[in-house]
Amino acid sequence: MALPVYYDKDIDLGVIQSLQVGIIGYGAQGEAQALNLRDSKVKVRIGLYQGSLSVSKAKKEGFEVLGVKELVQQSDVIMALLPDELHKEVLEKEVIPFLKEGQIVGFAHGFSVHFNQVVLPKGVGAILVAPKGPGSALREEYLKNRGLYHLIAIEQESSKNNAKAVALSYAKAMGGGRMGVLKTSFKEECESDLFGEQAVLCGGLEAIVRMGFETLIKAGYPEELAYFECVHEVKLVADLLHYKGVEGLRKHISNTAEFGAIKAREPMGNLLEKRMQKILKKIQNGSFAKDFLLEKSLNYPRLNTERKALKETKIEQIGEILRAPFNHKK
């Protein structure tokens, strides 16, 4: 691997155990991280605004809940586990004014720091600890004595505590050292994460799935078959990719499917490469971040319109029917 990788044997858990951790936010990531840290004998408190619906949940799970200002004043390490677009508003009002030299502020994604939404005072550390998976998987893997890969990065050093040692120790407390903790930068994590979401995992995959479905429908094929071939079976392929890689996927499909994939890749590849380069450039030059923050300032008009329209599409209507047996089993 090109990136440095650290495992449990390389990391001192005592570093984070000696510090008071405060987590701002108690969504999927906040809850999972808090529970994992506590099970790793780390002192954890939760910071929430007054009236938050998460207060009762956090208290029910045995955590002390403070206001954000109070949490900052009583913590050595403060983790900002809030949506990216809220970092600037919350941190500028309730975190930064109350920070002292030597404290460390942590993030699970590099967006707000990399795009200068958040600038921390000199002497305050800025670290990234990013589990490579959702909160549910982070908790489930920890309880199975396994873990998720974690990324760490250091943007700014603390005048008191070694930021790298703290980031590594925090990742170990969440189970990251069981799988591997990779050291990167805020820039690399942020830009690659956004690109993966837009070009492949969310934007790219959704576009291919929907276009494939519509192509079959317009050609007169039944909606059920179009859904099975273009949506339902994505999980089968994704699981093979996840566990066995591209070569392993090839070994588990028919010769017909493999030859067809190679033939289809040739015309699609050139077009996709050019489009992906444009997507990456807009991420790198800050255009996407600017557009997203403008969308937030206008109260998400495009997101709301798209979400409403999606419910009315054929792919969702037939999908809801075909997914019903699976959801019923859960």
Curated annotation (Swiss-Prot):
Q: Cofactor binding mode, per the note? A: Binds 2 magnesium ions per subunit.
Task: Fetch the InterPro entries from UniProt.
Answer: 6-PGluconate_DH-like_C_sf, KARI, KARI_C, KARI_N, KARI_prok, NAD(P)-bd_dom_sf
Q: Where is the active site?
A: 109
Kindly list the positions annotated as binding NADP(+): 26-29, 52, 54, 135
Kindly tell me the pathway this chain contributes to.
Amino-acid biosynthesis; L-isoleucine biosynthesis; L-isoleucine from 2-oxobutanoate: step 2/4; Amino-acid biosynthesis; L-valine biosynthesis; L-valine from pyruvate: step 2/4
Fetch the HAMAP family from UniProt: IlvC
**Function text:** Involved in the biosynthesis of branched-chain amino acids (BCAA). Catalyzes an alkyl-migration followed by a ketol-acid reduction of (S)-2-acetolactate (S2AL) to yield (R)-2,3-dihydroxy-isovalerate. In the isomerase reaction, S2AL is rearranged via a Mg-dependent methyl migration to produce 3-hydroxy-3-methyl-2-ketobutyrate (HMKB). In the reductase reaction, this 2-ketoacid undergoes a metal-dependent reduction by NADPH to yield (R)-2,3-dihydroxy-isovalerate.
Q: What is this protein called?
A: Ketol-acid reductoisomerase (NADP(+))
